[in-house]
């Protein structure tokens, strides 16, 4: 314990930045952590896990489309008597602190210039791109922290302790996000290169392959479980099709949004066309700059002496980023409509920051004027990032985010729903949305009549949210017929489906 205290004392600036990042997360979640479609399932699975009901999602069916890692953490908090909000607040603050300290630690290992390390660490601490993750009940905060920890462990000398930690981290990465094995494989490949000096290339490759293989055993069991439930490995997915250039363009614009401190997170149809022009231009500029810096690095590698650790961290960070971008673009076209926006690309935020910091640090500015100019630009850039984050944190903390926003929570229809008896069973054409309001039990949709019929309850209600097709025609598909209307406004209606002893199917003749 004393060693840890001394370690932190020697890195007081980094500790201060980490605490500042954690404080921003606290402020951003002051009125409640943000809630979205994914959140409803994460929370429902966590509560059902804690109550011994299995890993059931918001609609009461076994979850396959998302791994259970975050949900289990929420469930553990529930078992300890903590609310969902408090559990996630604590988790996200811890993740923010780990991410900042881990970034600084990696830069120290690489022996980066003190000022460059401070700029990079401050950017990670105050970037709105990360704050937007810390202000939601999402899997990204723990995933980012796990990636940073895995990078640190990979750089350790080969040994049983390192191998055991990598197995645990690789498994954890998968159970937090399905994309975990992509990171595990990237890290295992680079770890093979790192460990070859001790074991030789063949033995190192076999060792790291064995680590990866062992970590995939629980992954295989989970995927087989999913296949038995719905015939898929990771839930139903729909590819976007088209060219690989389309998601790569979106990624470039996302990089630009990181520079402008204006993260973009949209729906599944988000594309390059939805980004402001300034983020597009800056994103392309960032990619060109990284390419030039990498080219310069390789051209001058024989003339500039780099430490082994610096080269290793650059190789590790670059490989993780490159493989994940390639995988994400391929997945978007061939497997899943998941645009390469801020949320999708945040796992490689730290690796990319490390790449830029390591490459720019190789250029030594001999002119005092240039050094002062670089310092002034850095201060302005970081100040802009910090002010943007503070503004976002205050706004999120005051108003909430998405379905946790006060405007959404206090809608008249939602106030009415919150006053319904707690032993009621609810149905809706938007069950995940309603779950942000009704967290007492599963919310079934209009096609889950068998589950609705067998649910233990006293009375049933259906909350129908009004919506239209693209041509403006009202969408009434699956709306119950003959149910009495007990509440109505412009957003929707609440229908009385009668006692739970009655046959619910009578409303869908």
Regions found by a protein language model. Give the residues of each.
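Perimembrane helix-loop-helix junctions
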Residues: 2-4, 160-163, 183-216
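Membrane-embedded, lumen/periplasm-facing catalytic core of multi-pass transferases
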Residues: 377-435
């Amino acid at each position: 314990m004393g060693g840890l205290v001394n370690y932190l004392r020697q890195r007081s600036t980094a500790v201060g930045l980490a605490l500042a990042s954690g404080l921003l997360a606290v402020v951003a979640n002051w009125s409640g952590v943000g809630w979205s479609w994914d959140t409803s399932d994460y929370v429902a699975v966590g509560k059902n896990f804690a109550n011994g009901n299995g890993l059931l999602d918001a609609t009461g069916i076994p979850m396959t489309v998302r791994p259970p890692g975050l949900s289990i953490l929420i469930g553990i908090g529930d078992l300890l008597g903590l609310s969902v909000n408090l559990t996630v607040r604590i988790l996200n603050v811890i993740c923010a602190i780990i991410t900042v300290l881990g970034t600084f630690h990696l830069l120290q290992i690489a022996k980066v210039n003190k000022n460059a390390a401070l700029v990079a660490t401050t950017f990670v601490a105050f970037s709105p791109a990360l704050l937007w993750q810390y202000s939601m009940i999402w899997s990204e905060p723990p995933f980012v922290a796990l990636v940073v920890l895995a990078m640190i462990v990979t750089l350790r000398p080969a040994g049983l302790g390192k191998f055991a930690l990598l197995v645990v981290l690789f498994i954890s990465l998968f159970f937090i996000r399905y994309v975990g094995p992509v990171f595990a494989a990237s890290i295992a490949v680079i770890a093979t290169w790192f460990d070859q000096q001790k074991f030789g290339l063949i033995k190192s490759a076999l060792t790291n392959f064995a680590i990866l293989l062992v970590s995939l055993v629980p992954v295989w069991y989970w995927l087989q479980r999913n296949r038995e439930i719905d015939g898929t490995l990771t839930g139903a997915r729909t590819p976007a099709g088209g060219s690989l250039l389309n998601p790569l363009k979106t990624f470039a614009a996302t990089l630009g949004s990181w520079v402008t401190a204006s993260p973009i997170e949209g729906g599944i149809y988000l594309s390059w066309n939805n980004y402001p022009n300034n983020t597009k231009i800056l994103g392309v500029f960032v990619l060109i700059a990284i390419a030039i810096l990498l080219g310069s690095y390789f051209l001058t590698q024989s003339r500039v002496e780099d430490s082994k650790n610096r080269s290793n961290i650059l190789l590790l960070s670059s490989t993780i980023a490159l493989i994940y971008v390639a995988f994400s673009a391929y997945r978007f076209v061939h497997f899943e409509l998941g645009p390469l926006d801020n949320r999708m690309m945040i796992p490689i935020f730290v690796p990319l920051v490390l790449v830029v910091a390591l490459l720019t640090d190789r250029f030594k500015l001999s002119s005092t004027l240039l050094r002062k100019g670089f310092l002034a630009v850095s201060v302005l850039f970081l100040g802009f990032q910090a002010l943007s984050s503070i503004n976002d944190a205050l706004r999120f903390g005051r108003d909430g985010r998405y379905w946790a926003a006060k405007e959404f929570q206090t809608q008249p229809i939602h106030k009415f729903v919150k006053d319904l008896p707690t032993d009621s069973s609810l149905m809706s054409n938007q069950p995940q949305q309603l779950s942000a309001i009704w967290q007492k039990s599963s919310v079934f949709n209009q096609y889950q009549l068998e589950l609705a019929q067998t649910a233990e309850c006293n009375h049933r209600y259906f909350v129908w949210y009004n919506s239209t097709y693209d041509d403006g025609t009202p969408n009434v598909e699956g709306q119950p017929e003959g149910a009495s209307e007990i509440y109505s406004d412009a957003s929707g209606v609440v229908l009385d489906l009668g006692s739970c002893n009655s046959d619910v199917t009578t409303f869908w003749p």
